[in-house]
Amino acid sequence: MAKYFRDLGFETIDADDIVHEIIPEDERRRLAKVVFNNPAARKELEARVHPIVKERIESFIASRTKWPPIVVVPLLFEVGWEGLFGKVITVISPVDLQIERMCSTRGYTKDEAEKRIASQMPTEEKAVRSDFVIVNDSTIEKLKEKIAFLAEEIRKEFKGE
């Protein structure tokens, strides 16, 4: 999602990209096998990684010259950071489609995808707690159209129109 907003002229940052900078891919794969089967190990990893991610996000926001910046945080509600932002956008998809996409684009097994989804807040709850909701249940082109429409709404709202 960050890329699509960036293509529309917004300055963006993505929490997942920060994690990818902190933890090498082979280490992420190894850790995933542990943390998605061991809640205590997951909490320990999050306690180490989340403060670094939050610090980088706060630094990014503080250094922006173009407003509003777009910050993508897939686990926003789970980590309790929604108060850092003026508005919250949530992208939701049906669970079966999430699983299908995770398996086809990331190479996860169905079991791995299901464990990742189960470790997160249900999308319905995220949607209720959000200011804007984008339903991503179609093509990339349709998603881009929805993001472009929302980008215009955000610009209008930010300008006070």
What are these regions (language model features)?
Residues 16, 45, 70, 134, ...:
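Residue-level signal for inorganic ion chemistry
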Residues 11, 33, 87, 131-132:
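Well-ordered beta-strand positions
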Residues 1-34, 145, 152-161:
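Glycine-rich phosphate-binding loop of ATP-dependent small-molecule kinases
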